[in-house]
Regions:
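Bacterial N-terminal signal peptides
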Residues: 8-20
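Short, conserved secondary-structure segments in the cores of folded domains
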Residues: 71-74, 129, 135
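Positively charged n-region of N-terminal signal peptides that target proteins for export
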Residues: 1-4
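A detector of long soluble domains/segments in diverse envelope-associated and cytosolic proteins
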Residues: 126, 137-138
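Surface-exposed, glycine-biased beta-strand/turn segments
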Residues: 17, 21-95, 99-104, 140-141, ...
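Zn2+-dependent peptidoglycan hydrolase active-site motif and core
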Residues: 78-132, 158-164
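Short helix-onset patch at the extreme N-terminus, typifying the N->h transition
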Residues: 6-9, 38
């Protein structure tokens, strides 16, 4: 019996060496590719990876908060698509959803609901979404779609856009996509600024 047990153990070790275990859920956790445009001006936005951070009531954060310098900071479509929802509710506040190709959707939550010079919470929708942005409207990547605010349960917090990215009906961590978009768009901003400076004074260099 001891010899049989030793043989089985040796066989198991050999099998492990030949066929090492793959990381659990390696395939299901891989993020599918999706190149997007950063949804706010890079020089007016701060953000971090707050995916699944704890929230009140035992909730987990299902997106990334893009902290804006001020209310009415411009919000842009991250990719071409069609607006499928423009709505308001107590938690999300004023928000919109864009459906993109290949099963992707982007959510823009806590949009502005105040007037230009008040914190009333009942400002006109013309200060929430851009002209022509309504359900069924086609939008392009980088198109102005609305303005950041503190509507819903974000009231009293720093103005921001709670941004979500969904793929085939399920939310994904948007941070890696946003980080890549931020780097691309910010580099483009610096190039445009350098071009402008070159036209004024070629000796000034942006680093």
């Amino acid at each position: 019996m001891k010899q049989v047990g030793a043989f089985v153990a040796a066989l198991a070790v050999g099998f492990t060496l030949l066929f090492p275990a793959l990381p659990a859920q390696a395939h299901s956790d891989a993020s599918p590719p999706f190149e997007l445009r950063f949804p706010q001006e890079t020089d007016k936005t701060r953000f971090s990876n707050d995916w699944r951070a704890r929230r009140s009531g035992g909730r987990r954060h299902s997106g990334t908060d893009l902290i804006a310098d001020a209310k009415m900071t411009e919000v842009y479509a991250v990719a071409d698509g069609v607006v499928v929802k423009v709505n308001d509710n107590p938690r999300a506040g004023r928000y919109l959803i864009i459906e993109h190709a290949d099963g992707w959707e982007s959510y823009y939550i806590h949009l502005n609901n105040d007037g230009l010079d008040d914190d009333s919470g009942d400002g006109p929708w013309m200060l929430t979404v851009a002209p022509g942005v309504e359900e069924g409207a086609l939008v392009e990547a980088g198109q102005l779609i609305g303005w950041a605010g503190d509507s819903g349960n974000a009231e009293g917090n720093s103005p921001h856009t709670h941004f979500e990215l969904h793929f085939q009906g399920r939310p994904l961590n948007p941070y890696p996509y946003l980080e890549a978009a931020f780097e691309r768009d910010h580099a483009d901003l610096l190039r445009r600024m350098q071009t402008l400076l070159n036209q004024i004074d070629g000796s000034v260099q942006i680093t």
